[in-house]
């Protein structure tokens, strides 16, 4: 699979070719669910350690919402605002079924995160959309793809670190 040749809008409002992010070095592209997703907030907390790595986060918020969320969550990475889910669609990310979004196991996982200090936020975006992570090589080849199997299926910081080390 090749990364799409497309222009994206950043949290700053600036537009940029997606290929500019992987030109010369691999890119880890992380697609988040909605801003209130406790599992995404857990993943963001783990991604904060990678301040200098080439990681870009994609969300469904409008530019100002994305910028505000980035500040509130202290996200060091660049964020792409994709309220129409065009980039989600280009990477074949899909909406989850009822069982992938709501079930007893996910409820228990959410409670555990709440007890651990993570917080739910306001729902902004499609609550049924599942997340994903992709590694894009400098030639545009997508060498790794992770499609979430449910709303809690996000790559850990350790898994992201391994992706960064791939040659």
Describe each region flagged by the PLM.
Residues 18-48, 54, 58:
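Short active-site neighborhood of thiol/selenol oxidoreductases, capturing the structured segment around
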């Amino acid at each position: 699979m090749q990364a799409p040749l497309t222009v994206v809008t950043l949290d700053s409002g600036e537009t940029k070719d997606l290929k500019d992010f992987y030109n010369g070095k691999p890119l880890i592209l992380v697609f988040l669910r909605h801003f209130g997703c406790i599992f995404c907030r857990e993943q963001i907390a783990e991604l904060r350690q990678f301040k200098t790595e080439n990681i870009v986060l994609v969300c469904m918020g409008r530019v100002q919402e994305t910028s505000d969320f980035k500040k509130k969550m202290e996200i060091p990475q660049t964020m792409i605002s994709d309220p129409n889910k065009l980039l989600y669609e280009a990477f074949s990310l899909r909406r989850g079924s009822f069982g992938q979004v709501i079930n007893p196991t996910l409820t228990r996982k959410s409670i555990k995160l709440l007890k651990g200090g993570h917080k739910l936020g306001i729902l902004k975006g499609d609550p049924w959309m599942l997340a994903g992570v992709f590694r894009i090589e400098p030639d545009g080849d997508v060498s790794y793809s992770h499609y979430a199997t449910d709303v809690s299926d996000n790559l850990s910081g350790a898994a992201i670190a391994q992706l960064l080390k791939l040659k």
